[in-house]
Amino acid sequence: MADLKSTFLDVYSVLKSDLLQDPSFEFTHESRQWLERMLDYNVRGGKLNRGLSVVDSYKLLKQGQDLTEKETFLSCALGWCIEWLQAYFLVLDDIMDNSVTRRGQPCWFRKPKVGMIAINDGILLRNHIHRILKKHFREMPYYVDLVDLFNEVEFQTACGQMIDLITTFDGEKDLSKYSLQIHRRIVEYKTAYYSFYLPVACALLMAGENLENHTDVKTVLVDMGIYFQVQDDYLDCFADPETLGKIGTDIEDFKCSWLVVKALERCSEEQTKILYENYGKAEPSNVAKVKALYKELDLEGAFMEYEKESYEKLTKLIEAHQSKAIQAVLKSFLAKIYKRQK
């Protein structure tokens, strides 16, 4: 794994160098420095799970055959395209949410001299994906499918973000709009497609597969993405911020979180009143009341039960798949996220 990570980081250096020398733009020393700093901070700064999982998935689809140097480079490059996509989403997401930290560091727009320039940086990150795809995949038989895939997933994610933002619109804080169904829709589109389906879809295309023949794989991965986001919602409230690498703000931000939806299902009339009065307010005393209510309603227990049921359901779906190679890909994904702490 350490070896794969160092190979993966070497490919990042190649891709970054390509972009810093892009012939379509005359860079000044200052603009090249800005771009390099922005890329290192936002693209390279994450856990790299999504990107690395393209390489892992492709290896598993090759069923133990060693990858050629070219296959290794291309699978890493596709992994980095997903990391670029993630960086683009997060840079803009943090501005929209007015977040403070990301990955244990100040959000990019909070850095001195960055501010709203971060919006243009987000646009650049989005454009880089297609420059990488064009440079390294243009001659591949699956190039058009790759471009379509990235466009489709970006569109789905932006629509998920839209539902999230309009559901949690600041001027209309109405908890009655929140339900498990709305939560699922937001998560499916905003997180599951790009975080879970996209890495495996990239590996399948590289392996010469037609994605239309793998809708069952998409279904399992979307379900896995929903489980992952429910974990995220749980950790936002119950995990230690040091371990998590960020300060959870779902309560303050009036997020349509799995916890608040479950709380609404379990609340008495009196408890509902407490939730309505305190949810979505930034004062520490309001946040503390919501957290105390979550404890009272035993949402930790509800989450443990949900986690167990999800794991069993996903395992059953995976084991029903006819391809052992695809089973291995899906099992490796599930193993990475089951009972995670951050």
Swiss-Prot record:
Catalyzes the sequential condensation of isopentenyl pyrophosphate with the allylic pyrophosphates, dimethylallyl pyrophosphate, and then with the resultant geranylpyrophosphate to the ultimate product farnesyl pyrophosphate. It catalyses: isopentenyl diphosphate + dimethylallyl diphosphate = (2E)-geranyl diphosphate + diphosphate; isopentenyl diphosphate + (2E)-geranyl diphosphate = (2E,6E)-farnesyl diphosphate + diphosphate. Dimethylallyl diphosphate binds at residues 102, 190-191, 229, 246, 255. The lineage of its organism: Eukaryota, Viridiplantae, Streptophyta, Embryophyta, Tracheophyta. Mg(2+) 2 binds at residues 93, 97. It comes from the Eukaryota. GO terms for cellular component: cytoplasm. This is Farnesyl pyrophosphate synthase 2. Pathway: Isoprenoid biosynthesis; farnesyl diphosphate biosynthesis; farnesyl diphosphate from geranyl diphosphate and isopentenyl diphosphate: step 1/1; Isoprenoid biosynthesis; geranyl diphosphate biosynthesis; geranyl diphosphate from dimethylallyl diphosphate and isopentenyl diphosphate: step 1/1. GO terms for molecular function: (2E,6E)-farnesyl diphosphate synthase activity; dimethylallyltranstransferase activity; metal ion binding. Isopentenyl diphosphate binds at residues 47, 50, 86, 103. Its cofactor is Mg(2+). Its main location: cytoplasm. It comes from Arabidopsis thaliana. Mg(2+) 1 binds at residues 93, 97. Keywords: Cholesterol biosynthesis, Cholesterol metabolism, Cytoplasm, Isoprene biosynthesis, Lipid biosynthesis, Lipid metabolism, Magnesium, Metal-binding, Steroid biosynthesis, Steroid metabolism, Sterol biosynthesis, Sterol metabolism, Transferase. The keyword Ion transport does not apply. It is found in: Cytoplasm.
